Amino acid sequence: MASITQAAKSLLLKEFASAFALSMRQFFAPKATLNYPHEKGPVSPRFRGEHALRRYPNGEERCIACKLCEAICPAQAITIEAGPRRNDGTRRTVRYDIDMVKCIYCGFCQEACPVDAIVEGPNFEFATETREELYYDKDKLLANGDRWELEIARNIAMDAPYR
């Protein structure tokens, strides 16, 4: 009986030591998490974040008021009013609103746009304190486009072979 007791004690001590060693290795190993506000992980070029309206390099807005994005939006979050036809036969929007509360970030609006006017940009930090701040009008969308244009253009160029 003494030999069984001795074997059990040595076995349990060995198991305890190996478990403790494993715990210490993990404790001193490099951390797998990021300290979020100060460190940010990589974002995919196909990430669908905050919406933006883009401009052409000459400063003119890209949206031609075709209303394809409004028609394809499953959440009916987009409202567009087209202005009168211009002398060259094109149209531009008078009103372009997105209700970000309704938006499900599916990306259909971006896929439907024939001129890459509406895009979902790389910004994922757009929390607000009130719901009213999540109703984006044309000016807010154009400001987002101006702010994120370099990253948006890079992401579209990276995704071009797959479109």
Curated annotation (Swiss-Prot):
Q: Name a GO molecular-function annotation.
A: iron ion binding
Which amino acid positions bind [4Fe-4S] cluster 1, per UniProt?
63, 66, 69, 113
What is catalysed by this protein?
a quinone + NADH + 5 H(+)(in) = a quinol + NAD(+) + 4 H(+)(out)
Question: What keyword terms does UniProt attach to this protein?
Answer: 4Fe-4S, Cell inner membrane, Cell membrane, Iron, Iron-sulfur, Membrane, Metal-binding, NAD, Quinone, Repeat, Translocase, Ubiquinone
Similarity comment: Belongs to the complex I 23 kDa subunit family.
Highest rank taxon of the organism: Bacteria
Annotated Gene3D superfamilies: 3.30.70.3270
GO:BP terms for this protein? aerobic respiration
Q: How does it assemble?
A: NDH-1 is composed of 14 different subunits. Subunits NuoA, H, J, K, L, M, N constitute the membrane sector of the complex.
Q: How does it sit in the membrane?
A: Peripheral membrane protein
Please tell me where this protein is predominantly located.
membrane
Instruction: Give the record's GO CC terms.
Output: plasma membrane
Q: Does the keyword Cell membrane apply?
A: yes
- Protein's organism: Brucella suis (strain ATCC 23445 / NCTC 10510)
Q: What role is this protein assigned?
A: NDH-1 shuttles electrons from NADH, via FMN and iron-sulfur (Fe-S) centers, to quinones in the respiratory chain. The immediate electron acceptor for the enzyme in this species is believed to be ubiquinone. Couples the redox reaction to proton translocation (for every two electrons transferred, four hydrogen ions are translocated across the cytoplasmic membrane), and thus conserves the redox energy in a proton gradient.
**Entry EC number(s):** 7.1.1.-
Which protein are we looking at?
NADH-quinone oxidoreductase subunit I
> How many cofactor units bind, and how?
Binds 2 [4Fe-4S] clusters per subunit.
Cofactor(s) of this protein: [4Fe-4S] cluster
Q: Where is the protein localized?
A: Cell inner membrane
Domain 4Fe-4S ferredoxin-type: where? 53-83, 94-123
Give binding positions for [4Fe-4S] cluster 2: 73, 103, 106, 109
